[in-house]
């Protein structure tokens, strides 16, 4: 098996990219490539792109679709890395509903020479034991192929298979983390669950780095907020207790599909503890969350995937905002209202944020627009 001794998990902003689909559910390659380039922002956007994740509707596509979007993302990240002189990592989501399809996706990720693979063991319906599957079957495939790539675990209660625990057990994570190729976990959960991971990881005593990425991106504005005033000091002490003074290695931000520069800057100012800029960028990204929130039958309705795709269409990055079957969608009136909200959001961000940190789009010729048209400044 290939040694992973030189691999260190990439810190920073990871974006689980949306999958650009036709109304028939087919991956639109030219538009998918445009979306990847937009998210990278010439090096000012995502540090990592995560293909075929939950935001990418992996659970509503077949394996052909998952592998197609993975191929596109890996290729575009490789091209971008060469162009900007800095590596943009491409992580391939390999999770499928069955063990056989999941392993087929892992084999394909290896063939693509992807930087890493991401698996949600609790989402694989016929995998009775997450650590057994990751150790015996994933490890067995590596041994058979004679090649190894880093594996990152994915813990998200929303996609756990029926009858499975909503979250991975700490003892199972500890066992999997001891495997040479398991290098971290993406935790889509609140602060308490994230804290369980950070506290546990401090006692793993591993021979390699094990990174924890916050899958609820808005948590960083709380976790990294400076201890200013009585309330801030109390929050700071509580956060240190909950996380055992161990902060996330990176952030996985679905809304960075729409605001890649803003989220990159948000991560940086949070890490730096700059209270003024934390508040400013927190407000900027909160505008998108508010724009994605509607009411149906008196209850909040938040179709984030449909909104991210609609926003990319409004910014003229893509032409199709179709979602997969069963993905929550926008009604016509909601779609019109959302377009107006996006326009207001873009104008506010252009007025309030630092120069160079408002996302812009250099239109792709495949979309029949002249190159050099910048979008995102209103």
Residue ranges of predicted features:
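A short, hydrophobic/aromatic-rich structural module that often spans a beta strand
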Residues: 95, 112, 196-211, 335-341
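Catalytic alpha/beta core domains of metabolic enzymes, predominantly
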Residues: 144-301
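General structural feature for long, well-ordered alpha-helical segments within catalytic domains
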Residues: 27, 31-35, 65, 69, ...
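Active-site beta->alpha loop and helix N-cap motifs at the rims of alpha/beta catalytic domains
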Residues: 2-167, 325-330, 347-378
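Alpha-helical structural signal in soluble globular domains
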Residues: 68, 72-80, 108, 112, ...
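Structured C-terminal cap/extension of enzyme domains
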Residues: 41, 229-378
């Amino acid at each position: 098996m290939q040694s992973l001794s030189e691999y260190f998990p990439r810190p920073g902003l990871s974006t689980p990219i949306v999958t650009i689909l036709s109304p028939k559910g087919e991956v639109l390659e030219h538009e998918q490539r445009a979306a990847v380039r937009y998210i990278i922002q010439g090096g000012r956007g995502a540090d990592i792109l995560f293909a075929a994740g939950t935001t990418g509707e992996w659970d509503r596509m077949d394996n052909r679709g998952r592998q197609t979007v993975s191929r596109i993302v890996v290729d575009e990240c490789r091209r971008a890395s060469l162009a900007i002189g800095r590596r943009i990592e491409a992580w391939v989501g390999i999770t499928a509903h069955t063990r056989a399809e999941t392993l087929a996706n892992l084999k394909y990720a290896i063939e693509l020479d992807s930087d890493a693979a991401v698996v949600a063991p609790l989402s694989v319906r016929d995998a009775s034991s997450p650590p057994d599957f990751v150790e015996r079957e994933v490890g067995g495939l590596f041994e058979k192929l004679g090649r190894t790539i880093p594996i990152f675990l994915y813990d998200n209660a929303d996609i756990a298979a029926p009858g499975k625990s909503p979250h991975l057990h700490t003892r199972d994570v500890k066992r999997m983390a001891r495997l040479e190729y398991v290098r971290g976990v993406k935790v889509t959960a609140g602060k308490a669950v994230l804290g369980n991971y950070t506290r546990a990881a401090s006692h793993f005593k591993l021979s390699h780095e094990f990174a924890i990425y916050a899958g609820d991106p808005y948590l960083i504005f709380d976790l990294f907020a400076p201890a200013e005033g009585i309330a801030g000091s109390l929050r700071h002490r509580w956060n240190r207790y909950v996380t055992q003074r161990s902060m996330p290695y990176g952030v996985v931000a679905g809304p960075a599909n729409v605001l890649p520069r803003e989220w990159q800057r948000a991560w940086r100012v949070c890490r730096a503890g700059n209270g003024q800029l934390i508040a400013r960028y927190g407000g900027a990204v909160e505008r998108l969350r508010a724009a994605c929130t509607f009411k149906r039958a008196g209850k909040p309705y938040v179709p984030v995937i449909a909104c991210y795709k609609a926003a990319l269409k409004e910014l003229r990055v893509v032409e199709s905002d179709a979602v997969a079957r069963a993905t929550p969608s926008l009604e016509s009136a909601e779609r019109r209202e959302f377009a107006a909200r996006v326009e207001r959001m873009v104008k506010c961000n252009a007025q309030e944020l630092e120069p160079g940190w408002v996302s812009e789009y250099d239109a792709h010729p495949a979309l029949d627009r002249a190159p050099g048209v910048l979008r995102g400044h209103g």
